[in-house]
């Protein structure tokens, strides 16, 4: 891999990581009381694990997010990007960070912070009104966000432990250009069509 290709790879990974924060910011606006687990960049995209058990609907029941909700979440994300933002970096000590997580009702963040050693300095990134503890790295601003699409909702145990809470995981994909995104989505569609034809033959 050339140095230019390496820089491009690093940039798209940072962009995907930033998009997980954009999604979290959108979810915070849409679902007050939502709790967050972790939201990394992954191959081709990003995800964030969330807990909606304290977010109540008009019927008094906990709100659930399904694939049908993804277009409106994506729309909110695009609105945040259109408003413009710069990722603001800051550092806080462990006790201040712990107090912040407790004050904001972020129990999963509390668990992560409590495992850190005393005296640990913790990095934060702020995107508009949304703040999250995070090691980074991220892109600098909304202008560096490329093409993205939210793909699906799944369940995921907190920290991969089936004895812990089942969280809602929201997946997205992201690329530098709309053309790359379109190519990726077309490949997925072709793979699904092949699988469907294969299944049809097996059932004949």
Regions found by a protein language model. Give the residues of each.
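Active/ligand-binding-proximal structured segments within catalytic/core domains
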Residues: 12-30, 41
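Auxiliary tRNA-acceptor-end handling modules of aminoacyl-tRNA synthetases
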Residues: 1-14, 35-38, 47-204
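Catalytic palm active-site di-aspartate
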Residues: 43-45
């Amino acid at each position: 891999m050339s140095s230019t290709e390496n820089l491009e790879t690093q940039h798209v990974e940072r962009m995907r990581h930033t998009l997980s924060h954009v999604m979290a910011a959108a979810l915070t606006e849409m679902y007050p009381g939502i709790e967050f687990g972790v939201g990394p960049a992954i191959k081709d995209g990003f995800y964030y694990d969330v807990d909606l058990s304290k977010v109540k609907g008009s019927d008094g029941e906990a709100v659930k997010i399904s694939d049908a909700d993804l277009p409106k979440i994506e729309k909110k994300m695009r609105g945040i990007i259109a408003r413009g933002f710069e990722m603001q970096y800051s550092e806080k000590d462990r006790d201040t960070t712990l107090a912040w997580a407790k004050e904001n009702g972020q129990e999963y963040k509390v668990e992560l912070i409590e495992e850190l050693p005393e005296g640990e300095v913790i990095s934060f990134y702020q995107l508009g009104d949304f703040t999250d503890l995070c090691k980074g790295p991220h892109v600098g601003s909304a202008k560096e966000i490329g093409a993205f699409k939210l793909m699906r909702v799944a369940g995921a145990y907190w920290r991969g432990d089936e004895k812990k809470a089942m969280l809602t995981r929201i997946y997205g994909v992201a690329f530098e250009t709309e053309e790359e995104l379109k190519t990726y989505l077309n490949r997925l569609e072709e793979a699904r069509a092949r699988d469907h034809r294969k299944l049809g033959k097996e059932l004949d």
